[in-house]
């Protein structure tokens, strides 16, 4: 029976489509349980999923009082390259407030160009990426969630990642405390997986949309092989150079080299969750504010034990897996300590059986969390550190207990020094823009008692991805900025763009279509 259940689980979402979930108010109460439910439906196979909160929920009463938050080190993202293959690095700019940044983002020089739809804007992005470098207000430590927001508050998700601080006394900003990102048109994040191949969650608080691209985890190694061929100098210098977050590869190049991927656009008021070893990239459509943090589940532990590490020191963020294995995999702890744990990660296997109802998981999840001493943690790190404001003197920074692990930079992949804080509000509610599903997404409405107990989730069939001959309209991939420091290795001369495709990568020209995964079309 268990074998049959396992096979049924693997059959969920065989095309690796990005799935969209609409939890009810009740289903939204337990974050850990809902992530398990999403995986039981196969959401993890895409590497990325969208969650649209219930209409009764809100992250924050008002955003009217955030203009004086200080962006201490805005970063100008400079890209070089051609034919859909770029590198990106940062130039530090002078500090500015969020209000000043918003004004800059909406100025004639940096504003979003006129466009007919998202696809038209994507074409403009890739055609003009190397010109007029945008400025990103990234890696700002803090949260915009109100303290009284109990569900899906990124300041205290209460997942097993809390063991990192509880058992090891380690706090890494951006990993187990939230980061804020203030974006403008063309600000980007390059192809990467999360540090230690953790999960991540991103909430778009306000502003213009964010487009995401993702390669299914079961095809991540194919992207790595292609990146090594396209960036041979970086590959020779570091075995895990994609962790530097400098490599920009367009969807056209991915398609020409047979790399399966998907695309979706996130709008204000929506969550995106990335799954372990899901390579992702993307760009912002205009001024916006997002918040992100990593988290973990029991399914991640084997990923963490096998995660690649930056070997050159440019972007090394790591921590011991000891507490996670000792507490959550006690039967394998001794083998793991001796280096004899031969577990193999199964990218297709979900965390819980697909037949297990969402409503019956509470008695399984809660006792386990209680046994570990996990709870909905208050944002103690936030309360001790007020926001850095432009006119405020004597701003305090919360002391991080990281031993030799400095703060990681989510944008550049480098380790940097700690920064500060969090803010809360209490005014009128803000409106949440309506959302529109992406072209390759499944809509998931989990069943509940009111709509018919035990009824399987409603699914709107996704547009199937095929290995068609490229059409005229390009499908795009996103990018991020690299850290300040040495400039990227030389690429083909600047100026040529996606209309001149790069040669196909040897050995990847005629890939065998893997079981159950989709192939991204150029619409």
Swiss-Prot record:
Residues 428-440 have a biased composition (Low complexity). Residues 18-60 form the JmjN domain. GO terms for molecular function: chromatin DNA binding; damaged DNA binding; histone demethylase activity; histone H3K9 demethylase activity; histone H3K9me2/H3K9me3 demethylase activity; metal ion binding. It comes from the Eukaryota. Its cofactor is Fe(2+). Signal peptide: none annotated. 2-oxoglutarate binds at residues 136, 202, 210, 245. GO terms for biological process: cellular response to ionizing radiation; chromatin remodeling; double-strand break repair via homologous recombination; inflammatory response; positive regulation of chromatin binding; positive regulation of double-strand break repair via nonhomologous end joining; regulation of gene expression; regulation of protein phosphorylation. Fe cation binds at residues 192, 194, 280. Binds 1 Fe(2+) ion per subunit. Ubiquitinated via 'Lys-63'-linked ubiquitin chains. Deubiquitinated by USP14 with the help of TRIM14 leading to stabilization. Residues 448-458 have a biased composition (Basic residues). Residues 407-523 are annotated as: Disordered. Residues 146-312 form the JmjC domain. The keyword Transcription applies. It is found in: Nucleus. SMART domains: JmjC, JmjN. PANTHER family: LYSINE-SPECIFIC DEMETHYLASE, LYSINE-SPECIFIC DEMETHYLASE 4D. This is Lysine-specific demethylase 4D. It comes from Homo sapiens. The lineage of its organism: Eukaryota, Metazoa, Chordata, Craniata, Vertebrata.
């Amino acid at each position: 029976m268990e074998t049959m259940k396992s096979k049924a689980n693997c059959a969920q979402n065989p095309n690796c489509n990005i799935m969209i979930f609409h939890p009810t108010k009740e289903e939204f109460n337990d974050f850990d349980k809902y992530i398990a439910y999403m995986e039981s439906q196969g959401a993890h196979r895409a590497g990325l999923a969208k969650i649209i909160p219930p209409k009764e929920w809100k992250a924050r009463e008002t955003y009217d009082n955030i203009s004086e938050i200080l962006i201490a080190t805005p970063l100008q993202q400079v890209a070089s390259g051609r034919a859909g293959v770029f590198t990106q690095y940062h130039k530090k700019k002078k500090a500015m407030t969020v209000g000043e940044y918003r004004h800059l983002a909406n100025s004639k020089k940096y504003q979003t160009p006129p466009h007919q739809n998202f696809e038209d804007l994507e074409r403009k992005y890739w055609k003009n990426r190397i010109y007029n470098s945008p400025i990103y207000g990234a890696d700002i430590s803090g949260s915009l969630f109100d303290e009284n927001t109990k569900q899906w508050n990124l300041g205290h998700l209460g997942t097993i990642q809390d063991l990192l601080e509880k058992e090891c006394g380690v706090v890494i900003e951006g990993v187990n405390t939230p980061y804020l990102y203030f974006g403008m048109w063309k600000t980007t994040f390059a192809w990467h997986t999360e540090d230690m191949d953790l999960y991540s969650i991103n909430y778009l608080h306000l502003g213009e949309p964010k487009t995401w691209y993702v390669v299914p985890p079961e095809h991540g190694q194919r992207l790595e092989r292609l990146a090594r061929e396209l960036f041979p100098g970086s590959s020779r210098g570091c075995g895990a150079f994609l962790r530097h977050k400098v490599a920009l590869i367009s969807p056209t190049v991915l398609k020409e080299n047979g790399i399966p991927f998907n695309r979706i656009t996130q709008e204000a008021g929506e969550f995106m969750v990335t799954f372990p070893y899901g390579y992702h990239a993307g760009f912002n459509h205009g001024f916006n504010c997002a918040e992100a943090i990593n988290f973990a589940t029991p399914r991640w532990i084997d990923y963490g034990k096998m995660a690649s590490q930056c070997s050159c020191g440019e972007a090394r963020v790591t921590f011991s897996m000891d507490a996670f294995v000792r507490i959550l995999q006690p039967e394998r702890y001794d083998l793991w300590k001796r280096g004899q744990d031969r577990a193999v990660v199964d990218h297709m296997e979900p965390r819980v059986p697909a037949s297990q109802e969402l409503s019956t998981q509470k008695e399984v999840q809660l006792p386990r969390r209680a046994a570990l001493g996990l709870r909905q943690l208050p944002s103690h790190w936030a309360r001790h550190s007020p926001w850095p404001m432009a006119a405020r003197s004597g701003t305090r920074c919360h002391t991080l207990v990281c031993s030799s692990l400095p703060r990681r930079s989510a944008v550049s992949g480098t380790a940097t020094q700690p920064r500060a804080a969090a803010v809360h509000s209490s005014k009128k509610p803000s409106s949440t823009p309506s959302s529109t599903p992406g072209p390759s997404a499944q809509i998931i409405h989990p069943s509940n008692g009111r709509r018919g107990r035990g009824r399987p989730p409603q699914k709107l069939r996704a547009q199937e991805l095929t290995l068609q001959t490229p059409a005229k309209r390009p499908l795009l991939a996103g990018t991020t900025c690299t850290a300040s420091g040495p400039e990227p290795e030389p690429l083909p001369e600047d100026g040529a763009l996606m209309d001149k495709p790069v040669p196909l990568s040897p050995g990847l020209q005629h890939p065998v279509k893997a079981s159950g995964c989709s192939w991204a079309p150029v619409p």
